[in-house]
Amino acid sequence: MTKTAKVNDIVRDWVVLDAKDKVFGRLITEIAVLLRGKHRPFYTPNVDCGDFVVVINANKVKFSGMKLEDKEYFTHSGYFGSTKSKTLQEMLEKTPEKLYHLAVRGMLPKTKLGKAMIKKLKVYRDDKHPHTAQTSKKDAK
C-alpha cells in the first residue's frame, strides 16, 4: 500500500548549501528538488513536504560559457517604453537573491503550493546567515 504524506506528519529539515565554485544550473536543480520534497520516500505531489534551504556565498557561483555577458533579464511595468534589461553579471552583483528566486521559481509548480515552497528558500550573498540555530544538515550531497 502506498503511504501518502499528511501535513501534520511532515518534519522539515534545514539544509545549508554553499554556492561557492558550484555551477549555477546544477545548484538550482538541487535546490528545487529539496524545496519540493522529491528526495523523500513519502513524496506526495499535492502536499508541501520539502525542506528549508539556506544558500550561502550566493554571488560566488560559477556559470558556464559566456552567460555572464550574454544572458539578459527583462522587466516591464506595463507602460510604453518601460522595458528594462539587466545582464546576468549585473543581477549577480546587485541582487543575487532575486536571481536565485527567479531561477528556482521556474522549476516549481505555478500554484499556491509553489508560492509556499519558494518561501522556504533563504539566500545570502556571504557565508553569514541568521539561521544557525535551525540548521541541521550541511551540503545535501
From Swiss-Prot:
The keyword Ribosomal protein applies. The lineage of its organism: Bacteria, Pseudomonadati, Campylobacterota, Epsilonproteobacteria, Campylobacterales. One of its GO terms (cellular component) is cytosolic large ribosomal subunit. It comes from the Bacteria. This is Large ribosomal subunit protein uL13. Keywords: Ribonucleoprotein, Ribosomal protein. GO terms for biological process: negative regulation of translation; translation. GO terms for molecular function: mRNA binding; structural constituent of ribosome. This protein is one of the early assembly proteins of the 50S ribosomal subunit, although it is not seen to bind rRNA by itself. It is important during the early stages of 50S assembly. Part of the 50S ribosomal subunit. Belongs to the universal ribosomal protein uL13 family.
